[in-house]
From Swiss-Prot:
Part of the small subunit (SSU) processome, first precursor of the small eukaryotic ribosomal subunit. During the assembly of the SSU processome in the nucleolus, many ribosome biogenesis factors, an RNA chaperone and ribosomal proteins associate with the nascent pre-rRNA and work in concert to generate RNA folding, modifications, rearrangements and cleavage as well as targeted degradation of pre-ribosomal RNA by the RNA exosome. Involved in pre-mRNA splicing as component of the spliceosome. Binds to the 5'-stem-loop of U4 snRNA and thereby contributes to spliceosome assembly. It comes from Homo sapiens. SUPFAM superfamilies: L30e-like. This is NHP2-like protein 1. Residues 96-128 are annotated as: Important for U4 snRNA-binding. Keywords: Acetylation, mRNA processing, mRNA splicing, Nucleus, Phosphoprotein, Ribonucleoprotein, RNA-binding, Spliceosome. It holds the Pfam family Ribosomal_L7Ae. The modification Phosphoserine is found at residue 122. PANTHER family: RIBOSOMAL PROTEIN L7AE FAMILY MEMBER. One of its GO terms (molecular function) is U4 snRNA binding. Residues 36-48 are annotated as: Interaction with U4 snRNA and U4atac snRNA.
Amino acid sequence: MTEADVNPKAYPLADAHLTKKLLDLVQQSCNYKQLRKGANEATKTLNRGISEFIVMAADAEPLEIILHLPLLCEDKNVPYVFVRSKQALGRACGVSRPVIACSVTIKEGSQLKQQIQSIQQSIERLLV
Protein backbone atom coordinates (compact mmCIF):
# COMPACT_ATOMS: atom_id res chain seq x y z
CA MET A 1 0.00 0.00 0.00
CA THR A 2 1.63 3.26 -1.13
CA GLU A 3 1.07 6.82 0.08
CA ALA A 4 -1.36 7.40 -2.81
CA ASP A 5 -3.48 4.36 -1.85
CA VAL A 6 -4.18 5.58 1.69
CA ASN A 7 -7.48 7.37 2.18
CA PRO A 8 -6.77 10.96 3.34
CA LYS A 9 -9.54 10.55 5.94
CA ALA A 10 -7.30 8.00 7.72
CA TYR A 11 -5.49 10.58 9.84
CA PRO A 12 -3.24 10.34 11.86
CA LEU A 13 -1.45 7.48 10.09
CA ALA A 14 1.38 5.78 12.01
CA ASP A 15 4.78 5.51 10.31
CA ALA A 16 6.55 2.14 10.01
CA HIS A 17 8.40 2.48 13.34
CA LEU A 18 5.31 3.49 15.34
CA THR A 19 3.23 0.80 13.59
CA LYS A 20 5.67 -1.88 14.77
CA LYS A 21 5.56 -0.56 18.36
CA LEU A 22 1.75 -0.34 18.22
CA LEU A 23 1.28 -3.87 16.89
CA ASP A 24 3.72 -5.27 19.48
CA LEU A 25 1.77 -3.56 22.27
CA VAL A 26 -1.55 -4.77 20.81
CA GLN A 27 -0.17 -8.32 20.82
CA GLN A 28 1.01 -8.00 24.45
CA SER A 29 -2.29 -6.48 25.56
CA CYS A 30 -4.07 -9.44 23.93
CA ASN A 31 -1.98 -11.77 26.12
CA TYR A 32 -2.85 -9.69 29.21
CA LYS A 33 -6.59 -9.69 28.34
CA GLN A 34 -6.51 -5.90 27.82
CA LEU A 35 -7.71 -5.91 24.21
CA ARG A 36 -11.12 -5.56 22.56
CA LYS A 37 -11.25 -6.48 18.86
CA GLY A 38 -13.62 -5.00 16.28
CA ALA A 39 -15.31 -1.66 15.63
CA ASN A 40 -18.35 -2.46 17.79
CA GLU A 41 -16.26 -3.58 20.77
CA ALA A 42 -14.04 -0.49 20.42
CA THR A 43 -17.17 1.70 20.45
CA LYS A 44 -18.38 -0.03 23.63
CA THR A 45 -15.06 0.54 25.43
CA LEU A 46 -15.16 4.23 24.51
CA ASN A 47 -18.74 4.61 25.75
CA ARG A 48 -17.86 2.84 29.01
CA GLY A 49 -14.75 5.00 29.47
CA ILE A 50 -12.35 2.04 29.73
CA SER A 51 -10.26 2.64 26.60
CA GLU A 52 -6.56 3.63 26.77
CA PHE A 53 -6.29 4.18 23.00
CA ILE A 54 -7.85 3.01 19.72
CA VAL A 55 -6.03 1.51 16.71
CA MET A 56 -7.82 1.44 13.35
CA ALA A 57 -6.93 0.05 9.91
CA ALA A 58 -6.57 2.60 7.09
CA ASP A 59 -7.47 -0.02 4.48
CA ALA A 60 -10.93 -0.78 5.89
CA GLU A 61 -13.39 -0.99 3.02
CA PRO A 62 -15.37 1.27 3.07
CA LEU A 63 -13.44 3.43 5.55
CA GLU A 64 -16.69 5.11 6.66
CA ILE A 65 -17.61 2.06 8.78
CA ILE A 66 -15.00 3.11 11.36
CA LEU A 67 -15.00 6.89 10.94
CA HIS A 68 -17.41 7.30 13.87
CA LEU A 69 -14.57 6.19 16.19
CA PRO A 70 -12.30 9.27 15.78
CA LEU A 71 -15.28 11.52 16.62
CA LEU A 72 -16.07 9.47 19.72
CA CYS A 73 -12.37 9.49 20.69
CA GLU A 74 -12.26 13.30 20.44
CA ASP A 75 -15.36 13.54 22.69
CA LYS A 76 -13.89 11.14 25.27
CA ASN A 77 -10.35 12.55 24.99
CA VAL A 78 -8.86 9.16 24.01
CA PRO A 79 -5.87 8.99 21.60
CA TYR A 80 -6.44 7.17 18.30
CA VAL A 81 -4.26 6.19 15.36
CA PHE A 82 -4.51 4.43 12.00
CA VAL A 83 -2.21 1.64 10.80
CA ARG A 84 -1.94 0.71 7.13
CA SER A 85 -3.01 -2.94 7.19
CA LYS A 86 -6.09 -4.66 8.61
CA GLN A 87 -4.36 -8.02 8.02
CA ALA A 88 -1.39 -7.02 10.22
CA LEU A 89 -3.77 -5.65 12.87
CA GLY A 90 -5.68 -8.95 12.81
CA ARG A 91 -2.47 -10.95 13.29
CA ALA A 92 -1.41 -8.70 16.18
CA CYS A 93 -4.85 -9.22 17.77
CA GLY A 94 -4.29 -12.96 17.64
CA VAL A 95 -7.04 -13.81 15.15
CA SER A 96 -6.82 -15.27 11.67
CA ARG A 97 -9.17 -12.68 10.14
CA PRO A 98 -8.53 -9.00 9.34
CA VAL A 99 -9.41 -6.59 12.18
CA ILE A 100 -10.38 -2.99 11.30
CA ALA A 101 -10.40 -1.55 14.83
CA CYS A 102 -9.28 -2.51 18.31
CA SER A 103 -9.13 -0.91 21.73
CA VAL A 104 -6.49 -1.38 24.43
CA THR A 105 -8.40 -1.19 27.72
CA ILE A 106 -7.62 0.11 31.20
CA LYS A 107 -6.64 -2.45 33.83
CA GLU A 108 -5.61 -1.70 37.40
CA GLY A 109 -2.04 -2.76 38.18
CA SER A 110 -1.29 -3.55 34.54
CA GLN A 111 2.30 -4.48 33.69
CA LEU A 112 1.90 -2.65 30.36
CA LYS A 113 1.23 0.79 31.94
CA GLN A 114 4.63 2.30 30.97
CA GLN A 115 4.42 1.07 27.38
CA ILE A 116 0.81 2.26 27.05
CA GLN A 117 1.72 5.75 28.29
CA SER A 118 4.68 5.89 25.89
CA ILE A 119 2.45 4.95 22.93
CA GLN A 120 -0.23 7.46 24.01
CA GLN A 121 2.38 10.24 23.96
CA SER A 122 3.60 9.15 20.52
CA ILE A 123 0.03 9.20 19.17
CA GLU A 124 -0.66 12.62 20.70
CA ARG A 125 2.48 13.99 19.02
CA LEU A 126 1.06 12.80 15.66
CA LEU A 127 -2.18 14.70 16.29
CA VAL A 128 -0.42 18.05 16.86
